[in-house]
Amino acid sequence: MLGAMFRAGTPMTPNLNPEGGGHYFIDRDGKAFRHILNFLRLGRLDLPLGYGETALLRAEADFYQIRPLLDALRELEASRGTPAPTAALLHADVDSSPRLVHFSARRGPHHYELSSVQVDTFRANLFCTDPECLGALRARFGVTNEDRAEGGPHFRLEWAPRPAELPEVEYRRLGLQPLWTGAPGEPRDVVGTPSFLEEVLRVALEHGFRLDSVFPDPEDLLNSRSLRFVRH
């Protein structure tokens, strides 16, 4: 019935359902279908800039046999071409160095106790030739004081999770900072190499990369120090 609306000379019988009032009700998902209705109203294909659901829209148009819309989609895709994912390289290196920190803890009005705790500092270097993937990695991680001015294909991070034994004031005095990931309202601390590389792996797979090498132990992915991803 919907396809008939686009074909001149096709008789349209009224809806005989008493609840329809002589009109037709179209119950479809609005994600792509609203563009079909816009095409019906305007007589032209008017899609947002960068619209990436043309395959879904074409499937809907084919289902309803809307030939003018199918023709318009073919013209659009021919003008755009079909961009294939470009070849790219992603390399993630993580290094950790332990540090013994001494601090004094107040145990009473005139009682101070000297304590020590190990603090692990992590340094990560991400190299990616795909700017979109690198941007996603930058957005994935957050630190308190971060310089994002670094350009090119590199992205470097340094963080040190605070041990429970180390007071917050001493942690800040030492100039240490945590690293977190996740939504702004629900941040999760990145406590070490495995959790950091897990997030890198997620982003890499989301952008079409595949794992190419693991160092030093190929059998122990998340406890490695270096991951290399490629996209052909």
From Swiss-Prot:
It holds the Pfam family KCTD11_21_C. Keywords: Cell cycle, Developmental protein, Growth regulation, Transferase, Tumor suppressor, Ubl conjugation pathway. Pathway: Protein modification; protein ubiquitination. Residues 1-49 form the BTB domain. GO terms for molecular function: transferase activity. GO terms for biological process: positive regulation of neuron differentiation; protein homooligomerization; protein ubiquitination. Transmembrane segments: none annotated. InterPro entries: KCTD11/21_C, SKP1/BTB/POZ_sf, T1-type_BTB. Plays a role as a marker and a regulator of neuronal differentiation; Up-regulated by a variety of neurogenic signals, such as retinoic acid, epidermal growth factor/EGF and NGFB/nerve growth factor. Induces apoptosis, growth arrest and the expression of cyclin-dependent kinase inhibitor CDKN1B. Plays a role as a tumor repressor and inhibits cell growth and tumorigenicity of medulloblastoma (MDB). Acts as a probable substrate-specific adapter for a BCR (BTB-CUL3-RBX1) E3 ubiquitin-protein ligase complex towards HDAC1. When BTB domain is deleted, growth-suppressing properties are lost. Homopentamer. Interacts with KCTD6 and KCTD21; KCTD11 and KCTD6 or KCTD21 may associate in pentameric assemblies. Component of the BCR(KCTD11) E3 ubiquitin ligase complex, at least composed of CUL3 and KCTD11 and RBX1. Interacts (via BTB domain) with CUL3; initially a 4:4 stoichiometry has been reported, however, electron microscopy revealed pentameric states of the BTB domain. This is BTB/POZ domain-containing protein KCTD11. It comes from Bos taurus (Bovine).
